[in-house]
């Protein structure tokens, strides 16, 4: 096939230049329109924190530094003597959800584009700065707390940086959370003055059922 040879190229035709405005910059943030979306966002950040290598390393350090081997309520439940005992680290007086929500408020109020990893990173760093309160609990005690059955005094918690946290994030703590904190401080002082608190909820309690129409074997007295 013979190649076509162009003897002369004429580019003298009329040119038209079109001016286009600079494209609008689109931030990489997330918009939370409903309370449901906000809650989902916070829980996702929580998951990122708990599953991160940095958080796991911190919890390991926390347990080692404070020589944690037992539940703060049941000291006889010791991981050294009982292999099946599992301790969970509880956040108090602000839960991990509360802390994440407060950090989220900071980003929203300062027009910082929302990003899961950015917020999770800040929450994790607060742990390393010892600005969150932590306490070791057995699984049962931890569950009872979240059911509202027991109260954890602030003085029982590792809260060295709590005051610093409140001062730094005061503008971002919801008013209802501030009210709860004030009430917790009040109750903690009362417990400290009394020297103890009612832990009867943690004692054994047997429930016997009497079902109409059913006959149960009687215990034979010796």
Residue positions per predicted region:
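BZIP DNA-binding basic region
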Residues: 2
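C-terminal/domain-terminus segments
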Residues: 6-47, 143-222
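Short Cys/His-rich Zn2+-coordinating modules
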Residues: 47-60, 116-123
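Short, structured coil/loop segments at alpha-helix boundaries
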Residues: 51-54, 114, 138, 174
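Short cysteine-rich loop/turn motifs with clustered Cys
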Residues: 55-110, 138-140
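Extended, compositionally biased low-complexity polar/Lys-Gly-rich tracts
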Residues: 87-92, 132-141, 191, 198-200
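Short Fe-S-cluster ligation motifs
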Residues: 102-126, 167-189
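Short Cys/His-centered divalent metal-binding micro-motifs
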Residues: 112-119, 123-157
